[in-house]
């Protein structure tokens, strides 16, 4: 079979034998691809460093029966350099990569929209100019939208009556009107569903102006919605949540100390 080229994001890798690795790629035109990268663990490897997770590459591959073979790699974006040295960015990026793999569908099914979204999200994480929690929730919402799982935010998930509606029910598919509201629905604080819509639509001015309490609530709803569709939690999300909790605790203590200094002055 003929060689083929495609742009790809390296999602993960694991060892094979003494010198090789198996890499999982999210490609633009061939979807999820698993391939053997021969000799990349040797110090003389020509492209071992280009096949690390978070890398955006142009790859040439040879189709195989079970696994393809990587024959050439050209680096497009080396996001890892700005992600792996910051634990907050790293956990956020790992959650994105895991989500991409879970939502990519069958192997070799073209995934141009998910590939484009993932590249843009990793670029934003590496850049560090936007809050990581908002970037992750925006990515998860949009990735679910590509998969057909986006929660209803502006209309009732059951009868499509235009909103806004106050109630939200995961199994029903998002916001629900008073007539369709099932038992067990939650009523998020005012502004929470607006924040979810802003993240989904890319209204960063509105998203970044939301209070931290709303951001935390949104993270819980988004994670629960994704978990319900995947039927299990992402392995990386607990790491993200623990980091954000610790990060917020430090920020709160810092704010308290600043307040004390102001009062003493």
Curated annotation (Swiss-Prot):
Gene3D superfamilies: Nucleic acid-binding proteins, Recombination protein O, C-terminal domain. InterPro entries: ARFGAP/RecO, DNA_rep/recomb_RecO_N, NA-bd_OB-fold, RecO, RecO_C. GO terms for cellular component: bacterial nucleoid. It comes from the Bacteria. GO terms for biological process: DNA recombination; double-strand break repair. It holds the Pfam family RecO_C. Keywords: DNA damage, DNA recombination, DNA repair. Belongs to the RecO family. Involved in DNA repair and RecF pathway recombination. This is DNA repair protein RecO.
């Amino acid at each position: 079979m003929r060689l083929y080229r495609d742009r790809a994001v390296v999602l993960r890798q694991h060892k094979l034998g003494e010198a090789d690795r198996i890499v999982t790629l999210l490609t633009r035109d061939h979807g999820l691809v698993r391939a053997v990268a021969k000799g990349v663990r040797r110090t003389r490897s020509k492209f071992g460093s280009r096949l690390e997770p978070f890398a955006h590459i142009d790859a040439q591959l040879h189709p195989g029966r079970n696994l393809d073979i990587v024959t050439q790699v050209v680096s497009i974006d080396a996001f890892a350099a700005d992600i792996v040295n910051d634990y907050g960015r790293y956990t956020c990026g790992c959650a994105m990569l895991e989500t991409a793999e879970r939502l990519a569908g069958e192997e070799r099914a073209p995934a141009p929209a998910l590939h484009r979204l993932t590249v843009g999200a990793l670029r934003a994480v590496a850049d560090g100019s936007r809050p990581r929690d908002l970037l992750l929730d925006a990515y998860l919402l949009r990735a679910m939208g590509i998969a057909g799982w986006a929660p209803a935010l502006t209309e009732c998930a059951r009868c499509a009556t235009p909103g806004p509606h106050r109630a939200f029910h995961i199994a029903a598919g998002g916001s629900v009107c008073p007539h369709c509201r099932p038992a067990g629905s939650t009523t998020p604080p005012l502004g929470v569903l607006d924040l979810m819509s802003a993240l989904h639509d890319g209204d960063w001015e509105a998203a970044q102006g939301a209070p931290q309490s709303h951001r935390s609530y949104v993270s819980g709803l988004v994670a629960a919605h994704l978990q319900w569709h995947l039927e299990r939690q992402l392995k990386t999300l607990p790491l993200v949540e623990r980091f954000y909790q610790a990060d917020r605790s430090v920020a709160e203590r810092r704010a308290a100390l600043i307040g004390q200094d102001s009062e003493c002055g």
